[in-house]
């Protein structure tokens, strides 16, 4: 079943705004890296391209969030009469919060793919082109992983 993104529903509007803001905050970090550590003076590469990457990261976190929300809704319907777990650790509560999973997945994957592709492409290209290539490659990988998570984890099986 394809994911339906409920942008304006009362239940998810605050979560969507949080995902949008956190995706933008991650790109501010990469804009800072590009301008000050890599000395990229081209404003198109250092500011406008990360805005496009911001939209791609937001969309991938939204896809992952919606797939986890779908599974959570299904589990709530199934586990209405089960016993509740009394004690859980703070890190488990933090990781079970529905917004943290997609944010952590996308940010960790983006950082891994960005720095690995940047260090490989810096051997052959200039700083500006290597930064641009690394951002685009890592955003594409994040979208592919979000699609895989949506297909494998968020699948609703009808019996």
Predicted regions and their residues:
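Cytosolic-side membrane-entry/anchor segment at the start of a transmembrane helix
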Residues: 1-33, 149-159
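Alpha-helical transmembrane spans of integral membrane proteins, capturing the lipid-embedded, hydrophobic core
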Residues: 16-24, 47, 51-55, 107-111, ...
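Hydrophobic alpha-helical membrane-embedded segments
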Residues: 17-28, 33-71
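Alpha-helical transmembrane segments and their membrane-interface junctions
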Residues: 24-30, 100-132
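Alpha-helical membrane-inserting segments
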Residues: 25-29, 57-65, 116-121, 141, ...
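Juxtamembrane/interface segments at transmembrane-helix termini
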Residues: 61-74, 147-159
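Short membrane-interface loop/juxtamembrane segments of multi-pass integral membrane proteins
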Residues: 77-103
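Alpha-helical transmembrane segments and their immediate juxtamembrane interface regions
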Residues: 126-159
């Amino acid at each position: 079943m394809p994911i339906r993104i409920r942008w304006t529903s009362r239940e998810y509007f605050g979560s969507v705004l949080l995902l949008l803001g956190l995706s933008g905050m991650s790109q501010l970090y990469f804009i800072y890296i590009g301008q000050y550590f890599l000395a990229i003076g081209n404003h198109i590469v250092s500011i406008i391209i990360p805005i496009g990457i911001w939209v791609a990261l937001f969309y991938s976190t939204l896809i992952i969030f919606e797939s986890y929300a779908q599974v959570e809704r299904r589990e709530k319907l199934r586990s209405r009469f089960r016993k509740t777990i009394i004690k859980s650790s703070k890190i488990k509560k933090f990781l079970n919060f529905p917004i943290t999973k997609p944010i952590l997945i996308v940010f960790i994957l983006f950082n891994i793919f960005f720095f690995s592709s940047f260090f490989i492409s810096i051997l052959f290209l200039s700083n500006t082109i290597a930064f641009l290539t690394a951002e685009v490659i890592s955003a594409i990988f994040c979208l592919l992983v979000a699609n895989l998570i949506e297909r494998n984890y968020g699948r609703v099986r009808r019996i």
